[in-house]
């Protein structure tokens, strides 16, 4: 009995103890607070998580840096040359002295230059462009002035028809040898016909276009010819001849059919020089503006080089001019100066500083004819504003005697005078009373150093020339460009070149 009671008591105590434990576990630590003494260096949970995140990012970056980067393709310029030949009309040799021209300055540093380009006689726009393009003198290419007589009573002002050019221009020379060529606004490059017209040329010249517009138009056509975006307004041109020539010439295969000769003429500097004079602020501002337009053009060309040019092509930039510019003091109306009586027996084709006089309606008797011409020459000699040269008196170095287009007498004005069609009260008058031009050109460079012009030649990444050039002439430009393109000059062209690689 005692043992049974003891067993019951033990069981009761065990039950009570178990119930107490259950009650404690059920109510948990409610009401019980634990505190921890902070130690130096303790961090919050947020800080620890942020450090872990940053460590994970750093490990990822290190892994990326360890990866080998893709090799960058670099143009070494050891492929074919692509020549961009830009002629800037009226770019006088001293214009850079008072103009901000970072682009021209860079060309001077990276390549070669001279402000002593001595143009061939006559120092006029169309003859000079013809001389540069053909590598021959006016007696051979036939462009003896900006206004020429092609026959009795047939006068062409600012000739544009390429058929008037009597020697092969470089756009034909290059195309014939497989070089795809674009030529815009270069005198006598319009309306090309024959077997080897340039791949791209214009049918007409727009005198109102700015340099920026001309550059953009050429760039659009260049892009289109390279398989890029079509030009906004595609110019009329001949566009298939280069492909036919390309298949037959090694020079073409080097270019893969892409353009390798681009030729342009820019006019803004000449225009401002004529209107305001060569030393006017407006003229220097035009030099700066053209410099900026060229910088933008060539920055774009280089940015798109892999599309525009053949693989590893070397960009050659050739900047030339046709002539400089002199201050104009007086205009001369030659018909007014000679008078109606003398003009009955003369056709005169005059432009700027040069006039070609052709006799007409002379006496049939040789003796009478000789007497008449002698009297005529005597009257001409009384006019002090120009010198009169017979055909046999033309300086040989001018190479000016063309059998049909050079006059029986050549009149060359003094520096500072220009022939004009406008008529004033007197035959000699101020520019403000005539065309309102204050710049003149056409004078022999040996008489007016202001006819001298600027030349730059540089290449990227490899320049074909470095350092300062001395005096250079225009006759060598054709052969120089041919040499850089790896082709032969035209038959009859001067073969001397600038000292290019």
PLM features per residue range, with description:
Residues 1-15:
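N-terminal Sec-pathway targeting helices
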Residues 14, 24-39, 136-231, 249-278:
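His/Asp/Glu-rich, glycine-adjacent segments
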Residues 34-56, 64-80, 92-179, 190-199:
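Active-site nucleophile/metal-coordination loop of metallo-enzymes that catalyze phosphate/sulfate
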Residues 78-92, 107, 132, 174, ...:
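Beta-strand elements within well-structured catalytic alpha/beta cores of enzymes
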Residues 199-226, 283-292, 338-354:
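Acidic, His- and aromatic-enriched active-site or binding-groove loops in soluble protein domains
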Residues 212-216, 223-226, 271-315, 378, ...:
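A long, amphipathic alpha-helix that forms part
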Residues 314-364:
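Acidic/histidine-rich catalytic neighborhood
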Residues 350-480:
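Active-site neighborhoods of enzymes that stabilize oxyanions during catalysis
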């Amino acid at each position: 009995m005692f043992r049974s009671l003891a067993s019951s008591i033990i069981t009761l105590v065990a039950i009570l103890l178990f119930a107490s434990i259950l009650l404690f576990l059920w109510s948990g630590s409610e009401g019980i607070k634990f505190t921890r003494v902070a130690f130096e260096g303790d961090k919050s949970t947020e800080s620890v998580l942020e450090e872990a995140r940053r460590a994970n990012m750093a490990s990822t970056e290190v892994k990326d840096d360890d990866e080998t980067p893709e090799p960058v393709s670099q143009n070494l310029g050891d492929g074919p040359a692509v020549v961009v030949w830009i002629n800037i009309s009226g770019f006088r040799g001293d214009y850079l002295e008072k103009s901000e021209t970072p682009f021209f300055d860079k060309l001077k540093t990276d390549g070669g230059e001279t402000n002593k380009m001595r143009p061939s006689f006559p120092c006029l726009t169309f003859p000079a462009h013809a001389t540069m393009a053909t590598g021959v003198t006016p007696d051979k290419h036939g462009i003896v002035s900006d206004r020429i007589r092609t026959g009795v009573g047939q006068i062409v002002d600012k000739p544009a028809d390429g058929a008037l050019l009597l020697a092969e221009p470089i756009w034909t020379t290059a195309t014939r040898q497989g070089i795809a060529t674009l030529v815009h606004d270069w005198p006598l490059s319009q309306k090309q016909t024959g077997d080897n017209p340039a791949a791209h040329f214009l049918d007409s010249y727009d005198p109102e276009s700015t340099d920026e517009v001309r550059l953009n138009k050429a760039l659009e056509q260049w892009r289109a010819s390279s398989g890029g975006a079509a030009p906004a307004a595609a110019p009329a041109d001949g566009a298939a001849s280069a492909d036919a020539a390309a298949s037959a010439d090694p020079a073409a295969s080097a270019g893969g059919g892409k353009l390798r000769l681009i030729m342009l003429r820019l006019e803004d500097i000449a225009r401002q020089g004529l209107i305001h004079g060569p030393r006017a602020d407006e003229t220097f501002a035009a030099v700066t503006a053209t410099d900026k337009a060229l910088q933008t053009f060539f920055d774009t060309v280089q940015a798109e080089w892999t599309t525009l040019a053949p693989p590893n092509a070397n960009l050659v930039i050739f900047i030339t001019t046709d002539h400089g510019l002199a201050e104009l003091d007086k205009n001369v109306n030659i018909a007014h100066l000679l008078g109606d009586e003398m003009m009955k027996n003369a056709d005169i084709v005059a432009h700027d500083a040069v006039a070609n006089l052709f006799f007409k309606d002379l006496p049939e008797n040789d003796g009478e004819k000789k007497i008449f011409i002698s009297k005529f020459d005597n009257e001409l000699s009384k006019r002090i504003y120009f010198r009169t040269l017979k055909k046999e008196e033309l300086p040989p170095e001018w190479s000016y005697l063309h059998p049909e287009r050079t006059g029986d007498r050549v009149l060359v004005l003094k520096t500072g005078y220009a022939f004009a069609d406008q008529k004033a009260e007197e035959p000699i008058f101020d520019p403000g009373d005539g065309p309102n031009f204050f710049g003149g050109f056409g004078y022999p460079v040996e008489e007016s150093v202001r006819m001298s012009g600027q030349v730059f030649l540089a290449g990227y990444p490899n320049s074909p020339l470095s350092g300062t050039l001395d005096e250079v002439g225009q006759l060598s430009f054709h052969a120089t460009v041919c040499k850089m393109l790896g082709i032969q000059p035209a038959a009859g062209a001067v073969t001397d070149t600038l000292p290019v690689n």
